[in-house]
């Protein structure tokens, strides 16, 4: 293999924030955050969906509320529309 062109492959702790589940997987993702896990320090990445929380794997339906783009825009800039009227 050519030296210097491949990303670092290392163990990373992923945190599924939906069900508060942590797991260690090898990954090339980069992050500045770290976490102490089983006596070792690992890079730390949060995720919203994994096999622990996805309805296909759990067999349970779960409503994941994500604010829509229009609602987000209205929340951020709606005050300006009210002031101009």
Swiss-Prot record:
InterPro entries referenced in this protein's UniProt entry, alphabetically: Ribosomal_bL28/bL31-like_sf (IPR034704), Ribosomal_bL31 (IPR002150), Ribosomal_bL31_B (IPR027493), Ribosomal_bL31_sf (IPR042105)
Keywords from the UniProt entry: Ribonucleoprotein, Ribosomal protein
Classification via Pfam families: Ribosomal_L31 (PF01197)
Signal peptide segment: none
GO cellular component, one term: ribosome
Transmembrane region(s): none
BP GO annotations: translation
Reported induction: May be induced under zinc-limiting conditions; in that case may be repressed by the zinc uptake regulation protein zur.
GO MF term (any one): structural constituent of ribosome
NCBIfam families named in the record: L31 (TIGR00105), PRK01678.1 (NF002462)
Subunit structure: Part of the 50S ribosomal subunit.
HAMAP family: Ribosomal_bL31_2
Family affiliation: Belongs to the bacterial ribosomal protein bL31 family. Type B subfamily.
Protein name: Large ribosomal subunit protein bL31B
UniProt source species: Vibrio cholerae serotype O1 (strain ATCC 39315 / El Tor Inaba N16961)
Lineage: Bacteria, Pseudomonadati, Pseudomonadota, Gammaproteobacteria, Vibrionales
């Amino acid at each position: 293999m050519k030296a210097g062109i491949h990303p670092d492959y290392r163990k990373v702790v992923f945190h599924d924030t939906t069900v508060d589940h942590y797991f260690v997987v090898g990954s090339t993702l980069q992050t500045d955050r770290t976490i102490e896990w089983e006596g070792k320090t690992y890079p730390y990445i949060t995720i919203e969906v994994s096999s622990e929380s996805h309805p296909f794997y759990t067999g349970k339906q779960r409503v994941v509320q994500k604010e829509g783009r229009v609602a987000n825009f209205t929340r951020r800039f709606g005050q300006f529309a009210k002031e101009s009227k």
